[in-house]
Amino acid sequence: MTNIRKTHPLLKIVNHSLIDLPAPSNISAWWNFGSLLGLCLMIQILTGLFLAMHYTSDTATAFSSVTHICRDVNYGWLIRYLHANGASMFFICLYMHVGRGIYYGSYTYLETWNIGIILLFAVMATAFMGYVLPWGQMSFWGATVITNFLSAIPYIGTTLVEWIWGGFSVDKATLTRFFAFHFILPFIIAALVMIHLLFLHETGSNNPSGIPSDSDKIPFHPYYTIKDVLGFLILILLLTLLVLFSPDLLGDPDNYTPANPLNTPPHIKPEWYFLFAYAILRSIPNKLGGVLALVMSILILAIIPLLHMSKQRSMMFRPISQVLFWILVADLLTLTWIGGQPVEHPFITIGQVASILYFSIILIFMPLASLIENKILKW
């Protein structure tokens, strides 16, 4: 008799996705981040669900309800910090996953890559709205500053901002709708993940060499299931260490002060995972220009496949591109640092140089390096 996992309509899908899936024999630990992102999403949905049971999305009680969760709910503090730091883990995995895609040329799977970009935007939107919910000082002012950027859109800007706010400032209506969106988006993200995987399984996984691996495939289970489980254990260990030893390491102390529209914090800044984009935004003195640069800093991922000039897919055998890639990583770390600094000399200049370098590497230097490497191949 044929195994039920190969005949049952539902189990058949699981089987083709996770068990009998032919996978390249040489994919490294950089291919673990996809499954780790799935784990992060599950952790976030579960902890978020339990937080939503005790949270109230009203300006008068939001801050108190979060305090209540941490003080009075059984293990509420644990759930709250798992959720807050789980977001940080989510973004670490996201950036590693995208970096892997750029390094090994995975972006040539266009559908998978583009759904991935939509996913990145969706996760960023969810994280931003989630940061507003505790209704602390940084929640309120972060929401005010970021939503205000939409007013830079010509003609409809101001109307658009007031429409999003549901009034003339960030208030009760804004908080309520942000909670509604923050709740629904992760499920939309989960659906997009399914589409992401659907497109990936049309082509099969890439591998570090960038060379087609059809002639050398191994079953996903047990080889990569056990490898993924090791990744899960490492991620859970790191998250647990963070939550139990320094849960506020990545947070902002200002968010322990209830939101006050009459008192602006000295330094308004987002969570660490948005600082690189925030630095790019601030490095342009013009409002509309800054907003465009902010959007382009992520949207630039969509044109990376068009800029692929190399005859090789992966950077594994392309030393010049490798050097540029790691300069890009260092540049992003520099931008992250600058985003958290006050707007004063020398940080302004460093931020502007780093921003120009970010776009230059992707748009100019990497394609040029690829062309040079193509020439070197002929020597």
From Swiss-Prot:
Please state where this protein is localized: Mitochondrion inner membrane
Recorded GO molecular functions are: metal ion binding; ubiquinol-cytochrome-c reductase activity
Identify the cofactor(s).
heme b
- Residues reported to bind a ubiquinone: H201
Q: What is this protein called?
A: Cytochrome b
Membrane topology qualifier:
Multi-pass membrane protein
Q: Does the keyword Iron apply?
A: yes
Give the lineage.
Eukaryota, Metazoa, Chordata, Craniata, Vertebrata
Which cysteines link up through disulfide bonds? none
Tell me what else is known.
Heme 1 (or BL or b562) is low-potential and absorbs at about 562 nm, and heme 2 (or BH or b566) is high-potential and absorbs at about 566 nm.
Q: Where does heme b b566 bind?
A: H97, H196
State how the cofactor is bound.
Answer: Binds 2 heme b groups non-covalently.
Query: Membrane spanning segments where?
Result: 33-53, 77-98, 113-133, 178-198, 226-246, 288-308, 320-340, 347-367
A cellular-component GO term for this protein = mitochondrial inner membrane
The family classification in the record reads: Belongs to the cytochrome b family.
Instruction: Establish whether keyword Heme is in the entry.
Output: yes
Write out the entry's keywords from A to Z: Electron transport, Heme, Iron, Membrane, Metal-binding, Mitochondrion, Mitochondrion inner membrane, Respiratory chain, Transmembrane, Transmembrane helix, Transport, Ubiquinone
Q: What SUPFAM superfamilies does this protein's entry cite?
A: a domain/subunit of cytochrome bc1 complex (Ubiquinol-cytochrome c reductase), Transmembrane di-heme cytochromes
* UniProt-annotated binding residues for heme b b562: H83, H182
Q: How does it assemble?
A: The cytochrome bc1 complex contains 11 subunits: 3 respiratory subunits (MT-CYB, CYC1 and UQCRFS1), 2 core proteins (UQCRC1 and UQCRC2) and 6 low-molecular weight proteins (UQCRH/QCR6, UQCRB/QCR7, UQCRQ/QCR8, UQCR10/QCR9, UQCR11/QCR10 and a cleavage product of UQCRFS1). This cytochrome bc1 complex then forms a dimer.
Q: What is the protein's major site of localization? A: mitochondrion
User: Which Gene3D superfamilies has this protein been placed in?
Assistant: Cytochrome Bc1 Complex, Chain C (1.20.810.10)
* GO BP of this protein: mitochondrial electron transport, ubiquinol to cytochrome c
State the protein's purpose.
Component of the ubiquinol-cytochrome c reductase complex (complex III or cytochrome b-c1 complex) that is part of the mitochondrial respiratory chain. The b-c1 complex mediates electron transfer from ubiquinol to cytochrome c. Contributes to the generation of a proton gradient across the mitochondrial membrane that is then used for ATP synthesis.
